[in-house]
Amino acid sequence: MVNRTPGMGGEYQGPEHRRVQPTGPHVRSIIIVRHGRTAYNEQHRLQGQVDIPLDEVGEWQVRQTARTLRDLYVDGRPDIPKQLVVCSDLGRAVQTAHAFADPLGLDVHPDARVRERSFGAWEGLRLEELERDFTEDYQSWRHFAGGELKHGAEPKGAVGERGVEAIDGWSHRAGPDTTLFVFSHGAWISQTLQTLLGMAQGNHDFGAMTSMFNAHWARLTGADQPDGTVRWRMTEYNHGPAIADTDQWEAPTLH
């Protein structure tokens, strides 16, 4: 297994959102998975909310990840017999979710709140183009100072808020006999986790967590609090199947 630890994100915009945490029964654990590779990933283009499908390598990656997730958290956890599957409504995340869910006969629930951060006018551009044509704003973005906001990007705080709203809602639709699987995107995962875990309060630039690799995941477990809410704690981050730690991950032999 590959289990890499946190370090990258973005700036906070606007007043701190006061989250009203739900109470009552909740899922035992949450596994948040990034989609597999796309042509835009391979070309170093900024995807955002452009609806790009997985490429051939990405389809292979998600099959490896789906198999590992089923081995570890379905077959390997008979004490948690049920699974609830949610995904972004963008195709690359939907494909990744179905690679996991279809062999189990599970429904997949798309949710627009789980879609990737919008990068406005920068979407579809190569990183080298951004660096060349928007040098100052590009460097500001890379150093978590918000240069991308001048070009219509969604504020990171807003991404984190809608992400946590989705997590709060779905995690309370089932009980401790269930694992919630959420299939999403790199920026959404970073900004949602930092908001959910309280990291954004001390790091308003959202720079405390690395970006997740394609077809990798994070795992959260819940601790019940005296007031009836749940505190989510991250036990794994940037975890992938064993083959992800080899050169084959980006260049498998497919034919």
Across the structure, where does each feature detected by a protein language model lie?
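Alpha-helix termini
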Residues: R70-I80, H172-G175, D224-G228
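Short beta-strand scaffold positions
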Residues: C87-S88, E161, F183-S184
